[in-house]
């Protein structure tokens, strides 16, 4: 199976490359930008196109959101002209106001934000005009490296001694980019073998948690590992924000369909964070300049 991936520097693109390198049944062609022409599809002849998500579109620059939506539409038109399946990953933030109960796939987002509405309109057109598509809605992605690598950004900020601020009243399911990459390749392999299970799916980590609790847990686990290594680092703190005073905003995706159709189980975000922190610590061993003052006491 040959996949064409856009936006080479995105954390999900890097995760897909790592996953493909562990397998012998997947070939990846990765484009540097979020741009595609029908002629490029003719050259590569992929079995599917994969577009990584625009992370945190609610706080992104409006021009970036518009550009992403327009690029997705151009990709959809190219795929339609060459009958190439399209997989587009989108942020759970499209469900701007959340829901009290877990959100099923058939619930189409109806945001008030103009930028989010552009992304929803792109999804509507894909569903209407390109039968062979996967729209995969993701919880907040985290990874150690690449664009939108939330966990890497948190670690850099904490180690620099700067404080982090996170909402204590926004509940979601953090999602490992590595877990998404493994799931996407498995899903597309089944489609390539004739599953024909096109449509919208939800993919997120297990255990809903507030942004504040997630960031606090990352800080605690980081401090524990650094102490175990004998390193003294004055980590930045974590401060709680509260924007939804009446009740927490819950943005929790119901992921049963991806399990029932493709057999994809959600990975616990705590285990994924722990694994990535272990990898981050090993990388420090290979980079002496990254090590901080060691407590000699």
Roles of regions detected by a PLM:
Residues 183, 190-244, 284-290, 295:
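Mid/C-terminal beta-alpha module of Rossmann-like enzyme folds, strongest
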Residues 48, 73-112:
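Conserved Rossmann-fold NAD(P)-dependent oxidoreductase catalytic core, especially the SDR/UDP-sugar
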Residues 127-172, 179, 185-186:
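NAD(P)-dependent short-chain dehydrogenase/reductase
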Residues 6, 52, 86-92, 136-138:
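SDR active-site strand-loop-helix element
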Residues 1-24:
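N-terminal Rossmann NAD(P)H-binding glycine-rich loop of SDR-like oxidoreductase domains
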């Amino acid at each position: 199976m040959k996949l064409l991936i856009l936006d080479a520097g995105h954390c999900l693109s890097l995760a897909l490359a790592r996953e493909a390198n562990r397998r012998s049944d997947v070939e990846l062609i990765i484009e540097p930008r979020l741009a595609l022409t029908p002629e490029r599809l003719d050259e590569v002849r992929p079995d599917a196109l994969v577009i990584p998500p625009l992370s945190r579109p609610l706080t992104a620059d409006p021009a970036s959101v518009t550009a992403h939506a327009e690029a997705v539409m151009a990709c959809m038109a190219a795929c339609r002209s060459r009958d190439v399946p399209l997989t587009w990953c989108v942020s759970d933030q499209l469900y701007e106001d959340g829901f009290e109960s877990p959100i099923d796939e058939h619930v189409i987002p109806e945001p008030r934000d103009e930028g989010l509405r552009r992304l929803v309109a792109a999804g509507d057109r894909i569903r209407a005009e390109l039968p062979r598509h996967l729209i995969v809605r993701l919880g907040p992605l985290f990874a150690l490296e690449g664009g939108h690598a939330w966990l890497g950004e948190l670690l850099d900020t904490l180690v620099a001694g700067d404080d982090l601020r996170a909402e204590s009243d926004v509940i979601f399911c953090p999602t490992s980019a590595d877990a998404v990459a493994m799931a996407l390749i498995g899903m597309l392999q089944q489609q390539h073998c004739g599953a024909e299970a096109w449509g919208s799916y939800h993919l997120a980590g297990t255990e809903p948690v507030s942004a504040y609790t997630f960031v606090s847990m990352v800080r605690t686990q980081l401090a524990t590992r650094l102490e175990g290594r004998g390193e003294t680092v004055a980590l930045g703190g974590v401060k709680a924000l509260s924007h939804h005073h009446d009740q927490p905003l819950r943005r929790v995706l119901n992921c049963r369909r991806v399990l029932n159709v493709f057999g994809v189980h959600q990975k616990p975000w705590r285990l994924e964070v722990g694994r990535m922190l272990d990898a981050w610590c090993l990388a420090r061993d290979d980079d002496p300049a990254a090590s901080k003052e060691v407590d000699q006491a």
